Amino acid sequence: MAKFKAFLKRKDVEVSLKRYGIDALGAMAQGLFCTLLVGTILDTLGTQLGIGFLASPIVEINDVGYTIGKFASAMVGPAMAVAIGYALHAPAMVLFSLIPVGYATNVMGGAGGPLAVYVVTVVAAECGKIVSKETKIDILVTPIVTVLIGIGLAYFIASPIGKGAMAVGDVIKWATTQQPFVMGVLVSVIVGIALTLPISSAAICAALSLTGLAGGAALAGCCANMVGFAVISFRENGWGGVVSQGLGTSMLQMGNIVRNPRIWIPAIAASAITGPVATCVFKLEMNGAAVSSGMGTCGLVGPIGVWTGWANPSAEALLDGAQAIIPSAADWLGLALISIVLPAILAWLFGRLCRKLGWIKDGDLKLN
């Protein structure tokens, strides 16, 4: 046993909460941010501001047009895998071999793609590190072992992880059948949590065709998490944190959440309030694309989805009886309050309370 421990130490294989639960998760969120979320932001800028080189496809592959943003988004699996490998101190050959592992796993994982990539990449990277430079044909052995173990493991567990993520969708589907106040609380809290976890809230909302009042509640929960974390972590992260979390993803805080789960209280508490306010007070409906219900303020996709749904309801919304409307001042006020103003104020208040109680300490929300 002593020799085995010494071998693992020599290979820098450290089985610890910090290495796997904080470093790897935090790095994975950065990989997701640099691809899927930056791609989403670029597409949104191109479409809404009429920036030709961002809005127009730059090439067609198999009759599918790809914009710059779409290319960036397509690389989310490889980017997450490489980021995780980097956090695990994987040597170069292992790191490069994780690119196909991440791509395959994310595709097979569906709504649970990010979580599947995390689990599979950790195993593949550590196995690759163990065999790295142990043979005279390392240039063959290391990538073959990493790719075979990674994609082989993904074949068996990525799809079940995706189905497990969709089980969250079953809970959301049940919540949508409740009366508006209860539905607002449940959908907002659950979808907001899903947004921050390493699963795809957008994919879940799309699969459930979540539009109407339920879509509005989902939007409220996502915005509460993104804006909430951006505001309460301003002390530690400044304006860079506001942009990366408020327009990017609250998943960047996953490593810190593992370290101190209580930092999630302000955002969740805010979502429990903004959800029913959206459904009962403002009757806020997401009648744009269902996927927008799970995007929050990422590239402002969520609020823009509500706006486009007013004038041109999506096919999913039309099936639920949605109609085009001319938004009133109350509609615009509700959208602004639910998406940005209320989450910011409520999370700040709950954040101050948590800091006074000693539940959140300086540095707990610091992003690397």
Language model: regions and residue ranges:
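Pore-lining transmembrane helices
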Residues: M1-N368
